[in-house]
Amino acid sequence: MEVNQDVSVREQIFHDWVRECIICSLLFSTLYLLSYIVITKFKKHADFATVDVEDAAVNRIALWMCTFTLAVSVGAVLLLPFSIISNEVLLSVPHNYYIQWLNGSLIHGLWNLVFLFSNLSLVFLMPFAYLFTEAEGFAGSKKGVMSRVYETTVVLLLLTLLVFGIVWVASAIFDDDSAGRESLYDLWEYYLPYLYSGISLFGVLLLLLCTPFGLSRMFSVTGNLLVKPRLLENLEEHLSCTAFEEAAISRKISTKASCWLNLNMEALQKRLLAIQSHRITLEMRRRASPWQRNLVYPLAMLLLLALTGITVLIVCVNVLELLIDEAAMPKGIQGSQLGKVSFSVFGSFGAAVQVILIFYLMASSVVGFYSSPLFIQLLPQKQNTPMTKIIGNCVSLLILSSALPVFSRTLGITRFDLLGDFGRFNWLGNFYLILLYNMMFAGLATLCLVKKFTWAVQAELIRAFGLDRLPLSVKKIRSQGKA
């Protein structure tokens, strides 16, 4: 009887493992397909349609690696929201037959896979893809893809030895454990997590710089996508003037007599493109319904303001909790705690707000990253992004997204504890570092918003009432906006 029970238990464990493998494979296949579609929208087709078959093959292999990395990035973004939603589902319907596949073992497996694939992409795939696209083969060797593979492998091996040597020296300096200094064989259990801990710390610091700036930029980006209300504006007259100006500049560019005149054709082309863009915006506003013109934009601004205010408020409350209770410190857990208790005081509603805030912070960090002067050159262009820039974008997004769970837990956006190796980072136990990080985020976010709304709100009100057409007002607003 005991033998039969033991066999049934082992069969159940095996079936659960197979089910988890199938679910993880389906999820990753979906993310890989979506990532491939996104990258093909931005890649430069000339890199893949070249006459040189060897270069085209190299670019295809690099494209597959970039697609894998981008899929891991999307998975890292979805990791914490999926875990929070799964916990609430298990709390609501714990014994439902159709959600038996959703359990703590699956969630832990997803966290471990994201951690593993993030290490694989950052340490091996992306460096290999970049070196592979730049390789030409050793001097005197036979030309071909394999020659590039050999050169890339040798260079990557030397680079890996250099990086792990630096990691070993850093761990010997900052770690008091003497066994850690003496052992180089414990690569998987110690040095890879230590290296990823440093990368995660860099990603969290990058989020600290990009997210507050992105929170203020979100208002401008949303305003460019929506139709803004204009209370005292004659739209038809404005459209007519823009059309006349566009026709006049087009005539100057296309006329045969322009070659005899001292005209800056490049400046005229730029001016024409700006006027055409402005005309398209005006036509979109004319086609918009009154509800869309006068209601959608204010509601969107209020929603962004509410999300930003809630985020800053949660961070301020988290600072107070850090000073009072040690339980507010981010930590990792190894046991399965899913479906036991809600990680929000407000239950399912609070969990939904947490998920929305996590996605909002990630979107703000991406907007802030591509809007910053340091990284604006990485901004991809549709159908015109070279492979090296695609690799840089994939690495940047992976660093930001893999740091998102730690970032959200550090700021107190959620109380969902970090699972797997994400909770093993040594710097998460440093109280002063966590406290300073929260205070800096709250201060930077508040400073960016105050600076944004000081002149932006005034300028929007003046434009809404049509006062920007006054010459003095235009000069004053523009000079203040540039300052």
Swiss-Prot record:
Membrane topology according to the record: Multi-pass membrane protein
Cytoplasmic side: 43-60, 134-153, 216-294, 364-386, 451-483
Any one GO MF annotation of this record: transmembrane signaling receptor activity
Keyword match 4Fe-4S: no
Cellular compartment(s): Cell membrane; Endoplasmic reticulum membrane
Subunit relationships: Dimer. Can also form higher oligomers.
Task of the protein: May play a role in lymphocyte development by negatively regulating the canonical Wnt signaling pathway. May act as a LCN1 receptor.
Family: Belongs to the LIMR family.
Protein name: Protein LMBR1L
Species the sequence originates in: Xenopus laevis
